[in-house]
Swiss-Prot record:
Name of this protein: Bacteriocin E50-52
Record-stated family: Belongs to the bacteriocin class IIA/YGNGV family.
Record's keyword terms, sorted: Antibiotic, Antimicrobial, Bacteriocin, Secreted
Origin species: Enterococcus faecium (Streptococcus faecium)
Subcellular location(s) per record: Secreted
Its biological purpose: Bacteriocin active against the Gram-negative bacteria C.jejuni, Y.enterocolitica and Y.pseudotuberculosis, and the Gram-positive bacteria S.aureus, S.epidermidis, L.monocytogenes and Listeria spp. When added to the drinking water of chickens, causes a decrease in the levels of C.jejuni and S.enteritidis in the ceca, and in the levels of S.enteritidis in the liver and spleen.
């Protein structure tokens, strides 16, 4: 499953993509808001 958070999507292997930036994430909380806003 995926969890949408702003522009980022946290996937089942705990990575999110915000634009061209990838970062680790947590399915419970999604991507960091600051990361999605900066990307």
């Amino acid at each position: 499953t995926t969890k949408n958070y702003g522009n980022g999507v946290c996937n089942s292997v705990n990575w999110c993509q915000c634009g061209n930036v990838w970062a680790s994430c947590n399915l419970a909380t999604g991507c960091a808001a600051w990361l999605c806003k900066l990307a």
